[in-house]
Amino acid sequence: MEKYHGLEKIGEGTYGVVYKAQNNYGETFALKKIRLEKEDEGIPSTAIREISILKELKHSNIVKLYDVIHTKKRLILVFEHLDQDLKKLLDVCDGGLESVTAKSFLLQLLSGIAYCHEHRVLHRDLKPQNLLINREGELKIADFGLARAFGIPVRKYTHEVVTLWYRAPDILMGSKKYSTPIDMWSVGCIFAEMVNGRPLFPGVSETDQLMRIFRILGTPNSENWPNVTELPKYDPDFMVYEPLPWETFLKGLDDTGIDLLSKMLRLDPNQRITAKQALEHAYFKESN
């Protein structure tokens, strides 16, 4: 820690406190001080292993992890620092982003996700707060792999409930076999939010979250989602909803954009488009 000075607390994330600091050369970094659940046991070896994988991820759309400092009691991750995140931008952009901006951010998000999925790393906690942006319009994904290294928490460090808004229905219904499709669901939710300017499924509990999803996309059954009835939290008494036409809840997205989003937000994870496939979609071939 001696290398870094001028510590300024800039946030409390899901896993601990984030500081802005400078090194002796005047370069700015984001220091993420990880709170360990059981401090007496030290850092779990699984976390160390995951973090070492993160150091190997090198992509222009992923926040770079420069250094890992660990003592017996704490773990500090040294990341590149960016000034703003997508949530803050959406908060001030009433009615959503311009279509060219939304498309650029989505393309960058998918590029970073595709790279990580190719390297067998899941994010598991994608949301606008984890997407950092700079003045040049570059988007970088933060907190990659931390959900796996430290477990997806139920509450934030500040005792806020972790948002469920971007969580896939298979996870909400207790699936333990999750893979890359859970990230693609989150990407779809973020895409819709960039276009609409507000969250698509702002649930207040796991049950409410599922019902909000079903009210828009329809209630799943064995025909459109094989084996859904075997999920631990599937309820045969779920209210039955028919899917709504996409145009009714998406403003300002053309047909190719709707087609791409519909492939991201498939209820059945096995039917969801992959990041690599999404990058090849016609939506990115057309000019605005």
From Swiss-Prot:
Pfam families for the chain: Pkinase (PF00069)
Where are the catalytic residues?
A: 125 (proton acceptor)
The UniProt keywords, alphabetically, are: ATP-binding, Cell cycle, Cell division, Cytoplasm, Kinase, Magnesium, Metal-binding, Mitosis, Nucleotide-binding, Phosphoprotein, Serine/threonine-protein kinase, Transferase
Task: Give the record's subunit note.
Answer: May form a complex composed of at least the catalytic subunit CRK2 and a cyclin.
List locations, semicolon-separated.
Cytoplasm
Q: Which GO terms describe its biological process?
A: cell division
The name on file for this protein is: Cyclin-dependent kinase 2 homolog
What are the Phosphotyrosine sites (modified residues) in this protein? 15
Query: Where are the disulfide bridges?
Result: none
Record EC number: 2.7.11.22, 2.7.11.23
Substrates-to-products reaction catalysed: L-seryl-[protein] + ATP = O-phospho-L-seryl-[protein] + ADP + H(+); L-threonyl-[protein] + ATP = O-phospho-L-threonyl-[protein] + ADP + H(+); [DNA-directed RNA polymerase] + ATP = phospho-[DNA-directed RNA polymerase] + ADP + H(+)
Which family is annotated?
Belongs to the protein kinase superfamily. CMGC Ser/Thr protein kinase family. CDC2/CDKX subfamily.
Q: Name one GO cellular component term.
A: nucleus
- Could you give a GO molecular-function term held by this entry? ATP binding
Can you give the residue ranges of the Protein kinase domain? 4-284
What's the encoding gene here?
A: CRK2
Source organism of the structure? Plasmodium vivax
Chief localisation class: cytoplasm
Which cofactor(s) are needed, names only? Mg(2+)
Q: Which function does this protein serve? A: Serine/threonine-protein kinase. Involved in the control of the cell cycle. Required for entry into S-phase and mitosis. Probable component of the kinase complex that phosphorylates the repetitive C-terminus of RNA polymerase II.
State the top-level EC class.
transferase
Q: Which residues carry this modification: Phosphothreonine?
A: 14, 158
Looking up PANTHER family in the UniProt record yields: CELL DIVISION PROTEIN KINASE, CYCLIN-DEPENDENT KINASE 5
Q: Which InterPro entries match?
A: CDK (IPR050108), Kinase-like_dom_sf (IPR011009), Prot_kinase_dom (IPR000719), Protein_kinase_ATP_BS (IPR017441), Ser/Thr_kinase_AS (IPR008271)
